[in-house]
Amino acid sequence: MVRFLLLNGPNLNRLGMREPHIYGHTTLAQLEKQLTEFASEYAVELTCYQSNYEGALIDQIHRAESLYDGIIFNPGAFTHYSYALRDAIASIQTPVIEVHISNIHAREPFRHQSVLAPVTAGQIVGLGVNGYRLAILALLDMVEGKGK
C-alpha cells in the first residue's frame, strides 16, 4: 500500500473559522476525514499531521523519508520565509507537493513568493480544499512512475 503524509502548517488548525471567505467553511478535522476517505479509494494510506511550530514540521519531513512515499504540504505562512523547511525538503528524496487553499499569487504581495516551491515536486494553489485531492492524485501518479 502506498503511504502519504499530509502536513498542515500554522493556523490551518483554524480552518472553517479563520477567514472563511478565503479558506472556506471546512474544518481541519472534516478535511482530514474527507482526504483519508478519498485516499483510501486509491489504496493510499494517509497520515495527517498539523503543527504551528516550524521545528515539529521539520521533524515530520525528516521522519517521512523512511516512512512515506510522498508528502502533501500546506506550509501556511512558512511558505514565504522558512529556509529551514526548504532545506528539510531538499534533504530528502521523498516527493513533496506544496498546496495552498487560496491563490497565493493573487493575494498580498508578501504572499506571492514561495521559498519552498523550487525544492518541491509541484505546487497547487487557489483551488480550495480540492487542491489536496489533486495533490494526492499527482503524487500517486509520481510514485507509480507515470508522472516522471
From Swiss-Prot:
Major enzyme class: lyase
- Pathway membership: Metabolic intermediate biosynthesis; chorismate biosynthesis; chorismate from D-erythrose 4-phosphate and phosphoenolpyruvate: step 3/7
**Alphabetized PROSITE patterns for the sequence:** DEHYDROQUINASE_II
Superkingdom is: Bacteria
The alphabetized UniProt keywords are: Amino-acid biosynthesis, Aromatic amino acid biosynthesis, Lyase
Please tell me where substrate binds in this chain. Answer: N74, H80, D87, I101, S102, R111
Q: Name one GO molecular function term.
A: 3-dehydroquinate dehydratase activity
Which EC number(s) does the record attach to this protein?
A: 4.2.1.10
Q: Which SUPFAM superfamilies match?
A: Type II 3-dehydroquinate dehydratase
Q: What are the residue positions of the site described as Transition state stabilizer? A: R18
Q: Which GO terms describe its biological process?
A: amino acid biosynthetic process; aromatic amino acid family biosynthetic process; chorismate biosynthetic process; quinate catabolic process
- What interactions and quaternary structure are annotated? Homododecamer.
Name listed for the protein in its UniProt record? 3-dehydroquinate dehydratase
Q: Which organism is it from?
A: Anoxybacillus flavithermus (strain DSM 21510 / WK1)
